[in-house]
């Protein structure tokens, strides 16, 4: 509790953030060469920050959705980012679309486990090692319950 009310810029605040990052790396098996950032707000802010900063409008992008949060990421891609080379891949609520149809050169945004529907991808076999596209993964409902294939995930977001 000694850090409550203290700035994240203070020595104590920085130490607590470093501890949270180090513990996250250890608990989740995040590789040493992966960067970990802590953002204010929720996973919504984190995934939107990743989308806004990592998706290139000149590249093809696929956003896959099978539950409510994935549909929010589609709306962000369509209405906010206005990505011109956008492929939307959806399935009925609670069903998983055929992810093997996503071109490996495309950047891809997906939700690992549907928080609201419970539908989850079983693995990342549909992502080829060394694929060309950037992979942005909303792992909020999966990060502490599923094994993450870090080698295939460029940006993984979650909330505590």
Regions found by a protein language model. Name each.
Residues 2-49, 66-71, 75-76:
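Conserved N-terminal alpha-helix of the aminotransferase class I/II PLP-enzyme fold
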Residues 44-160:
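Conserved PLP-enzyme active-site core in the AAT-like
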């Amino acid at each position: 509790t000694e850090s409550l009310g203290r700035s994240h810029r203070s020595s104590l605040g920085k130490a607590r953030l470093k501890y949270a990052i180090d513990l996250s790396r250890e608990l989740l098996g995040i590789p040493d060469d992966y960067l970990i950032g802590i953002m204010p707000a929720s996973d919504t802010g984190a995934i939107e920050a990743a989308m806004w900063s990592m998706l290139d409008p000149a590249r093809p992008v696929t956003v896959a959705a099978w539950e409510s949060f994935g549909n929010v990421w589609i709306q962000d891609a369509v209405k906010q980012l206005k990505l011109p080379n956008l492929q939307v891949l959806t399935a009925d609520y609670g069903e998983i679309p055929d992810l093997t149809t996503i071109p490996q050169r495309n950047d891809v945004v997906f939700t690992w486990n549907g928080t609201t529907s419970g539908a989850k991808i079983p693995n990342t076999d549909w992502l080829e090692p060394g694929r060309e596209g950037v992979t942005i993964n909303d792992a909020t409902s999966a990060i502490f319950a599923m094994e993450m294939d870090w080698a295939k995930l460029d940006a993984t977001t979650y909330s505590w």
